[in-house]
Design a protein with these regions (language model features):
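Histidine-centered metal-chelating micro-motifs
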Residues: 116-129
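Active-site region of the double-stranded beta-helix
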Residues: 1-113, 133-183
Length: 183
Protein backbone atom coordinates (compact mmCIF):
# COMPACT_ATOMS: atom_id res chain seq x y z
CA UNK A 1 0.00 0.00 0.00
CA UNK A 2 1.26 3.51 -0.79
CA UNK A 3 2.65 5.62 2.02
CA UNK A 4 0.17 8.23 3.27
CA UNK A 5 1.23 11.71 4.24
CA UNK A 6 -0.47 14.37 6.32
CA UNK A 7 -2.45 16.46 3.85
CA UNK A 8 -2.68 19.61 5.98
CA UNK A 9 -1.46 20.48 9.47
CA UNK A 10 -1.25 23.35 11.90
CA UNK A 11 0.98 21.93 14.66
CA UNK A 12 -0.78 21.81 18.02
CA UNK A 13 -4.15 22.57 16.40
CA UNK A 14 -5.26 20.06 13.75
CA UNK A 15 -4.25 17.62 11.01
CA UNK A 16 -6.07 16.24 7.97
CA UNK A 17 -4.96 12.70 7.17
CA UNK A 18 -6.26 10.98 4.02
CA UNK A 19 -7.54 7.44 4.34
CA UNK A 20 -5.86 4.89 2.08
CA UNK A 21 -8.21 3.70 -0.69
CA UNK A 22 -7.94 -0.07 -0.89
CA UNK A 23 -10.71 -0.84 -3.35
CA UNK A 24 -13.48 0.88 -5.28
CA UNK A 25 -16.17 -1.36 -6.78
CA UNK A 26 -19.79 -0.80 -7.74
CA UNK A 27 -21.43 0.60 -4.62
CA UNK A 28 -18.47 -0.17 -2.32
CA UNK A 29 -15.69 2.05 -1.00
CA UNK A 30 -13.08 0.18 1.06
CA UNK A 31 -10.49 2.37 2.83
CA UNK A 32 -7.75 1.74 5.36
CA UNK A 33 -7.07 4.00 8.31
CA UNK A 34 -3.38 4.96 8.31
CA UNK A 35 -2.29 3.70 11.73
CA UNK A 36 1.17 5.21 11.32
CA UNK A 37 -0.31 8.51 12.57
CA UNK A 38 -1.78 7.02 15.73
CA UNK A 39 0.83 6.37 18.43
CA UNK A 40 -1.72 3.91 19.83
CA UNK A 41 -5.49 3.60 20.18
CA UNK A 42 -6.81 3.73 23.74
CA UNK A 43 -10.52 3.89 22.89
CA UNK A 44 -12.68 3.63 19.79
CA UNK A 45 -15.80 5.73 20.21
CA UNK A 46 -18.84 5.10 18.01
CA UNK A 47 -20.92 8.29 17.99
CA UNK A 48 -24.37 8.48 16.39
CA UNK A 49 -26.09 11.85 16.01
CA UNK A 50 -29.75 12.25 15.16
CA UNK A 51 -30.88 14.98 12.79
CA UNK A 52 -29.28 18.33 13.63
CA UNK A 53 -27.67 17.07 16.85
CA UNK A 54 -25.52 19.58 18.75
CA UNK A 55 -22.58 18.37 20.83
CA UNK A 56 -22.12 19.52 23.46
CA UNK A 57 -25.68 20.68 23.89
CA UNK A 58 -26.72 23.91 25.59
CA UNK A 59 -25.85 24.39 29.26
CA UNK A 60 -28.00 26.95 31.04
CA UNK A 61 -27.79 30.27 29.17
CA UNK A 62 -24.83 29.07 27.05
CA UNK A 63 -26.31 27.87 23.77
CA UNK A 64 -23.04 26.70 22.12
CA UNK A 65 -20.50 25.53 24.70
CA UNK A 66 -17.30 23.58 23.98
CA UNK A 67 -15.58 20.34 24.93
CA UNK A 68 -11.86 20.27 25.67
CA UNK A 69 -9.92 17.12 26.55
CA UNK A 70 -6.76 17.93 28.53
CA UNK A 71 -5.40 14.38 28.16
CA UNK A 72 -6.88 13.00 24.90
CA UNK A 73 -6.25 13.42 21.17
CA UNK A 74 -9.27 12.93 18.89
CA UNK A 75 -9.03 11.26 15.47
CA UNK A 76 -12.44 11.64 13.81
CA UNK A 77 -13.75 9.75 10.79
CA UNK A 78 -17.29 10.49 9.63
CA UNK A 79 -18.96 7.34 8.29
CA UNK A 80 -22.30 8.80 7.24
CA UNK A 81 -24.00 12.16 7.16
CA UNK A 82 -22.31 15.47 7.83
CA UNK A 83 -20.53 16.97 10.82
CA UNK A 84 -19.83 20.68 11.09
CA UNK A 85 -16.83 20.79 13.40
CA UNK A 86 -15.48 23.92 15.06
CA UNK A 87 -12.13 23.84 16.80
CA UNK A 88 -10.46 26.56 18.85
CA UNK A 89 -7.07 26.94 20.49
CA UNK A 90 -5.83 29.92 22.46
CA UNK A 91 -2.74 30.25 20.22
CA UNK A 92 -4.38 29.50 16.86
CA UNK A 93 -7.90 30.93 17.08
CA UNK A 94 -10.91 29.24 15.53
CA UNK A 95 -11.26 27.01 12.46
CA UNK A 96 -14.34 25.29 11.05
CA UNK A 97 -14.66 22.19 8.89
CA UNK A 98 -17.54 20.31 7.31
CA UNK A 99 -16.66 16.62 7.36
CA UNK A 100 -18.47 13.95 5.32
CA UNK A 101 -17.43 10.42 4.35
CA UNK A 102 -16.25 11.72 0.96
CA UNK A 103 -14.56 15.06 1.67
CA UNK A 104 -13.62 17.85 4.04
CA UNK A 105 -14.62 21.43 3.38
CA UNK A 106 -13.64 24.63 5.13
CA UNK A 107 -16.28 26.41 7.20
CA UNK A 108 -16.99 28.72 4.25
CA UNK A 109 -17.69 25.73 1.97
CA UNK A 110 -14.38 25.72 0.07
CA UNK A 111 -13.11 22.22 -0.71
CA UNK A 112 -10.11 21.37 1.47
CA UNK A 113 -9.70 17.65 0.70
CA UNK A 114 -11.60 15.62 -1.90
CA UNK A 115 -11.68 12.09 -0.53
CA UNK A 116 -12.20 10.26 2.75
CA UNK A 117 -10.00 11.64 5.52
CA UNK A 118 -9.51 11.77 9.27
CA UNK A 119 -9.74 15.11 11.09
CA UNK A 120 -7.39 15.11 14.07
CA UNK A 121 -7.15 17.57 16.92
CA UNK A 122 -4.82 17.13 19.89
CA UNK A 123 -5.47 17.54 23.59
CA UNK A 124 -6.29 21.04 24.84
CA UNK A 125 -8.11 22.00 21.63
CA UNK A 126 -11.68 23.13 22.23
CA UNK A 127 -14.21 21.56 19.89
CA UNK A 128 -17.91 21.37 19.19
CA UNK A 129 -20.04 19.73 16.53
CA UNK A 130 -23.38 20.14 14.79
CA UNK A 131 -24.69 17.31 12.61
CA UNK A 132 -26.50 17.93 9.36
CA UNK A 133 -30.23 17.41 8.81
CA UNK A 134 -29.60 13.75 7.92
CA UNK A 135 -27.79 13.11 11.23
CA UNK A 136 -24.37 11.49 11.22
CA UNK A 137 -22.30 8.54 12.40
CA UNK A 138 -18.61 8.58 13.21
CA UNK A 139 -15.74 6.72 14.77
CA UNK A 140 -13.24 8.51 16.97
CA UNK A 141 -9.92 6.85 17.68
CA UNK A 142 -8.94 8.33 21.04
CA UNK A 143 -5.35 8.49 22.24
CA UNK A 144 -5.06 8.96 26.01
CA UNK A 145 -2.19 10.53 27.93
CA UNK A 146 -1.21 10.48 31.62
CA UNK A 147 -3.83 12.23 33.70
CA UNK A 148 -6.76 11.04 31.56
CA UNK A 149 -9.82 10.69 33.79
CA UNK A 150 -13.22 9.66 32.37
CA UNK A 151 -14.92 11.79 35.04
CA UNK A 152 -13.36 15.01 33.67
CA UNK A 153 -12.56 14.13 30.05
CA UNK A 154 -15.92 15.40 28.76
CA UNK A 155 -16.13 18.57 30.83
CA UNK A 156 -17.99 21.37 29.09
CA UNK A 157 -16.69 24.92 28.89
CA UNK A 158 -17.69 28.43 27.94
CA UNK A 159 -15.12 30.48 26.05
CA UNK A 160 -14.37 34.18 25.89
CA UNK A 161 -12.30 34.15 22.71
CA UNK A 162 -11.57 37.89 22.83
CA UNK A 163 -10.04 37.59 26.30
CA UNK A 164 -8.54 34.14 25.69
CA UNK A 165 -10.29 32.77 28.78
CA UNK A 166 -12.50 29.78 29.48
CA UNK A 167 -14.31 28.28 32.44
CA UNK A 168 -16.04 25.04 33.36
CA UNK A 169 -19.84 25.15 33.10
CA UNK A 170 -20.70 21.44 33.43
CA UNK A 171 -18.80 18.48 34.77
CA UNK A 172 -18.58 15.83 32.08
CA UNK A 173 -19.34 12.83 34.27
CA UNK A 174 -22.88 14.13 34.85
CA UNK A 175 -23.81 13.10 31.29
CA UNK A 176 -22.14 9.67 31.33
CA UNK A 177 -22.93 6.16 32.46
CA UNK A 178 -19.83 5.65 34.56
CA UNK A 179 -19.34 3.18 37.37
CA UNK A 180 -19.15 4.79 40.82
CA UNK A 181 -15.65 5.82 41.92
CA UNK A 182 -13.67 3.20 43.81
CA UNK A 183 -13.43 4.07 47.51
Amino acid sequence: MAEVEIFQEVAGFYRLIPLQPLRRTAGVWFDNIPLAFLPRIDAIDRVIHRTGAVSPGPVGAVSRPWYMHPHQDDNLIVLSGRRDVEIYHLEHGRRSFTVTPEQIRDGDGALVYDGPAMLVWPREVFHRIVSGPEGSASLNFAVHYPGMDPRTNFNIYELDEAAGKYWLIREGFRDQNLPPPVA
